[in-house]
Amino acid sequence: MEEFTIYTGTTVPLMNDNIDTDQILPKQFLKLIDKKGFGKYLMYEWRYLDNNYTENPDFIFNQPEYREASILITGDNFGAGSSREHAAWALADYGFKVIVAGSFGDIHYNNDLNNGILPIIQPKEVRDKLAKLKPTDEVTVNLFEQKIYSPVGDFSFDIDGEWKHKLLNGLDDIGITLQYEDLIAQYEQNRPSYWH
């Protein structure tokens, strides 16, 4: 996983509440097992008019000024529903680095973090301000300081200390384990021979 320290990008507002994992990535795309390639299917039912991938010009992700946005501003209960990690894969593959919501489905919140996406919880008044940013306005998210810096104000956010450490250092669960490789080897060496 890449380190997440300070990130600057532009925003796209999708202010719906209760966007569930089936809306983020419909079930028919769960057959793929590689993390790459899911971005094409993100918000499939909203982004496309038909199965030929004809873009819906009214959907905000398809509007030219928002195509490069990497910070999603959204409503409450983002990522509720089934526990499919594929939804986080789709968000990451599309290019999202930060998601600002009123709340998250618990499992989806962890899936985002495990895939290098920073989920940030903010109240409605903050999200409403961020949703009014121009498509070219840059927002900086500083994980060290736990702050969002934007043209409409600066906002603090909370994050669990363990997750913060993992993101700042680019560590997934395997990376955390490998930090203790010497101790693990020593433990294995000291085990009785009948375990070898």
Swiss-Prot record:
Catalytic activity, EC: 4.2.1.33
Reaction catalysed by this enzyme: (2R,3S)-3-isopropylmalate = (2S)-2-isopropylmalate
Gene3D superfamilies registered for this protein in UniProt: Aconitase, domain 4 (3.20.19.10)
GO molecular function per UniProt: 3-isopropylmalate dehydratase activity
Top-rank EC class of the record's enzyme: lyase
SUPFAM superfamilies: LeuD/IlvD-like (SSF52016)
Function: Catalyzes the isomerization between 2-isopropylmalate and 3-isopropylmalate, via the formation of 2-isopropylmaleate.
Name listed for the protein in its UniProt record: 3-isopropylmalate dehydratase small subunit
Record organism: Streptococcus mutans serotype c (strain ATCC 700610 / UA159)
Gene name of this polypeptide: leuD
